[in-house]
């Protein structure tokens, strides 16, 4: 139990074992007398200590080696005997002393805040006694030890994903970005042709879906000559490609121009093929609706059957295949076979892949 050295000096005269047993075993009737005697002894000791303190304040910086040796001997004798003192005796002794006086620098009771200031109330190395022990460093708590251990550890690297389909691994301590998009940028305006725009066509027909679809059909028929223009443009580009390929001495410009023309031909042909496929699907859907109306009109059906998008695509492919010639069918089948074989080869392990 930590007790100041000043408190030890006051109760030093009554810490003999025989006297302490007598003090703890006496009845309550004798406590008043002993309390009075102890109070008188303590008052005398307080006066003596006050005189000693005044003398120490007058002669500041001068300490006797004999007094230090006596204090060390007394503290060594008192410390083992303090373990046998009961809490009741300590409470009575503290109540008899009254208020504690503020410890001076000579008793070693300097507050930790004032002790931190260098050169203020701190004894010089020459004034400090040779036998004085240094205070041990405060022990760290388990939480502080845990923090210190984690601070020394290097950051752990995240393992890679098990496969490309697995989710990305990210630490739970990853800081979320504080940047927020307050105002969205305005969308980039897209080029719209009013002749083929569905919004313009529906507005011109007062929102009627049937008339809007009819208007779109009429617009496609009215501007069907654009398809012929596209075909003519693709034919002209192919002629330019053939002339560049037959050229003997090609420059870097010719090579770049040839690559650009090939890309343009591929893009335009794909776009033309997409238009034809959509037109074929639209025709299939129109024919199916016409058949359903006839069946309902004849009374063979009560509700029409609506084709799904996948069924429309299948019927459009079958119709396009029937309209092809013999050579075109062979080419289409060969392209289909190569496409399926390429997909199967990708799923095949490397050891079984053989170049045909």
UniProtKB/Swiss-Prot annotation:
It holds the Pfam family RRP36. Its main location: nucleus. Residues 202-216 have a biased composition (Low complexity). Keywords: Coiled coil, Nucleus, Ribonucleoprotein, Ribosome biogenesis, rRNA processing. Residues 28-75 have a biased composition (Acidic residues). It is found in: Nucleus, Nucleolus. Residues 230-278 form a coiled coil. Residues 154-164 have a biased composition (Basic residues). Residues 323-333, 341-356 have a biased composition (Basic and acidic residues). InterPro entries: RRP36. The keyword Ribonucleoprotein applies. Residues 1-217, 323-356 are annotated as: Disordered. One of its GO terms (biological process) is maturation of SSU-rRNA from tricistronic rRNA transcript (SSU-rRNA, 5.8S rRNA, LSU-rRNA). One of its GO terms (cellular component) is 90S preribosome. Associates with 90S and pre-40S pre-ribosomal particles. PANTHER family: RIBOSOMAL RNA PROCESSING PROTEIN 36 HOMOLOG. Belongs to the RRP36 family. Component of the 90S pre-ribosome involved in the maturation of rRNAs. Required for early cleavages of the pre-RNAs in the 40S ribosomal subunit maturation pathway. This is rRNA biogenesis protein RRP36. The gene is RRP36.
């Amino acid at each position: 139990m930590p007790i100041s050295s000043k408190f030890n000096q006051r109760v030093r005269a009554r810490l003999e074992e025989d006297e302490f047993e007598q003090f703890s075993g006496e009845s309550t009737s004798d406590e008043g007398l002993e309390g009075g005697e102890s109070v008188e002894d303590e008052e005398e000791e307080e006066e003596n200590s006050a005189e000693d303190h005044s003398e120490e304040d007058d002669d500041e910086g001068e300490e006797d080696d004999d007094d230090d040796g006596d204090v060390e001997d007394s503290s060594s004798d008192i410390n083992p005997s303090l373990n046998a003192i009961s809490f009741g005796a300590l409470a009575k002794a503290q109540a008899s002393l009254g208020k504690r006086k503020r410890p001076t620098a000579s008793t070693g009771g300097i507050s930790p805040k004032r002790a931190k200031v260098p050169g203020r109330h701190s004894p010089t190395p020459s004034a400090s006694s040779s036998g004085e022990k240094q205070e041990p460093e405060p022990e760290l708590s388990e939480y502080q030890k845990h923090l210190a251990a984690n601070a020394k550890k290097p950051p752990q690297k995240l393992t890679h994903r098990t496969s490309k389909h697995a989710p990305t691994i990210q630490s739970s301590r990853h800081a979320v970005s504080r940047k927020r998009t307050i105002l969205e940028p305005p969308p980039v305006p897209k080029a719209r042709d009013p002749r083929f725009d569905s919004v313009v066509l529906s507005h011109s027909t007062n929102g009627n879906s049937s008339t809007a679809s009819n208007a779109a059909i009429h617009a496609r028929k009215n501007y069907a000559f654009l398809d012929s223009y596209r075909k003519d443009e693709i034919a002209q580009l192919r002629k330019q490609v053939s002339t560049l390929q037959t050229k003997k001495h090609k420059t870097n410009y010719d090579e770049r121009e040839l690559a650009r023309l090939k890309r343009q031909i591929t893009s335009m042909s794909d776009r033309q093929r997409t238009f034809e496929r959509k037109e074929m699907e639209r025709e299939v859907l129109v024919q199916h609706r016409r058949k359903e109306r006839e069946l309902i009109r004849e009374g063979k059906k009560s509700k029409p059957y609506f084709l799904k998008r996948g069924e429309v695509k299948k019927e459009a492919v079958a119709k396009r295949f029937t309209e092809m010639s013999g050579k075109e069918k062979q080419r289409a089948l060969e392209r289909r076979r190569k496409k399926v074989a390429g997909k199967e080869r990708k799923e095949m392990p490397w050891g079984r892949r053989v170049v045909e």
